[in-house]
């Protein structure tokens, strides 16, 4: 009788230990997945595509940074731009304020990016190191987290 009781206690103890270990592994895995998503704020987002079309390589890659104070800044490829934004859970509203007006060679990408900055963004999505800005019709621009050049 005593051996059966000890055996049952041992089995229950092992089951509890296995359950705790599996729970800890799942929690660690979930934390790792969540940690892989870059934050919207203070990440150097490099433009990858506009309306589903990849942009060509440029000397200065078009980019945007959303700052903690509610402002955004970036480079169109030649000119710099700035404005304000408001964000909540997966929601974003951007107010473009202005840009410099230097004349540069091949401003096709710059004009396309600038035109889209005037879109009425409503949502954003971050999947690991990819930022997607969306309007009411879906994806407008896609960015990847890059390294800001010095």
Indicate residue ranges for each PLM-predicted region:
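Bacterial N-terminal signal peptides
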Residues: 11-21
């Amino acid at each position: 009788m005593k051996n059966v009781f000890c055996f049952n206690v041992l089995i229950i103890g092992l089951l509890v230990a296995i359950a705790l270990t599996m729970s800890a592994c799942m929690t660690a895995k979930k934390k790792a997945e969540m940690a892989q998503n870059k934050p919207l704020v203070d990440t150097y987002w490099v433009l990858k595509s506009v309306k589903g079309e990849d942009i060509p390589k440029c000397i200065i890659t078009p980019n945007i940074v959303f700052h903690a104070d509610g402002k955004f800044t970036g480079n169109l490829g030649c000119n710099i731009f700035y404005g304000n934004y408001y964000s909540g859970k997966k929601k974003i509203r951007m107010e473009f304020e202005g840009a410099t007006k230097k004349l540069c060679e091949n401003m096709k990408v710059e004009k396309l990016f600038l035109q889209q900055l005037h879109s009425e963004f409503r949502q954003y999505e971050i999947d690991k190191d990819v930022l997607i800005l969306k309007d009411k019709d879906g994806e407008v621009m896609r960015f990847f987290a890059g390294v800001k050049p010095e």
